[in-house]
From Swiss-Prot:
This is Retinol-binding protein 4. GO terms for biological process: cardiac muscle tissue development; detection of light stimulus involved in visual perception; embryonic organ morphogenesis; embryonic retina morphogenesis in camera-type eye; embryonic skeletal system development; eye development; female genitalia morphogenesis; gluconeogenesis. It comes from Homo sapiens (Human). The modification Omega-N-methylarginine is found at residue 139. Pfam families: Lipocalin. The keyword S-adenosyl-L-methionine does not apply. It is linked to Retinal dystrophy, iris coloboma, and comedogenic acne syndrome: A disease characterized by retinal degeneration, ocular colobomas involving both the anterior and posterior segment, impaired night vision and loss of visual acuity. Additional characteristic features include developmental abnormalities and severe acne. Microphthalmia/Coloboma 10: A disorder of eye formation, ranging from small size of a single eye to complete bilateral absence of ocular tissues. Ocular abnormalities like opacities of the cornea and lens, scaring of the retina and choroid, and other abnormalities may also be present. Ocular colobomas are a set of malformations resulting from abnormal morphogenesis of the optic cup and stalk, and the fusion of the fetal fissure (optic fissure). The gene is RBP4. Residues 1-18 form the signal peptide. Substrate binds at residue 116. Belongs to the calycin superfamily. Lipocalin family. Retinol-binding protein that mediates retinol transport in blood plasma. Delivers retinol from the liver stores to the peripheral tissues. Transfers the bound all-trans retinol to STRA6, that then facilitates retinol transport across the cell membrane. Keywords: Disease variant, Disulfide bond, Methylation, Microphthalmia, Retinol-binding, Secreted, Sensory transduction, Signal, Transport, Vision, Vitamin A.
Amino acid sequence: MKWVWALLLLAALGSGRAERDCRVSSFRVKENFDKARFSGTWYAMAKKDPEGLFLQDNIVAEFSVDETGQMSATAKGRVRLLNNWDVCADMVGTFTDTEDPAKFKMKYWGVASFLQKGNDDHWIVDTDYDTYAVQYSCRLLNLDGTCADSYSFVFSRDPNGLPPEAQKIVRQRQEELCLARQYRLIVHNGYCDGRSERNLL
């Protein structure tokens, strides 16, 4: 009888793993993503950090779509250099379309040379366009198809945060990305609002 319970336990564990496929190729993205509706100002509320030096808090991104339909973005935020020097810095990104309207290749660079630059996948996992958005990027795959170096942002249209119903959806998307409890909250305290030139890069 013990072996029956052992088989049942293994089956339960197996089904649990099946429900949570952490291969990047299995992750869902926003269906019929609309770049025009997504454009405008987004405030980063939470972030799963990658390797390297990126904007750390007070992050505000502005997405736009030109007359040819190409999406681009600028972002401003605080960066700490040498463990004790806080500056506000800008990053710029341009997006190349793929066959999936919610999956882009994003070429990005910092206006200041110390910030990261690269050409990463940029996926819009989910958004309602008016309240929340979840972005995901995997920069390096493991041999088993899971991600070795990823980053992800939770965005809000409101700098004061997300309403409870949106928070619930976001938590579900974080689980689906196998990134639950790996995000840190992003502060918005006005540090980069109207800073003097000596604090801007």
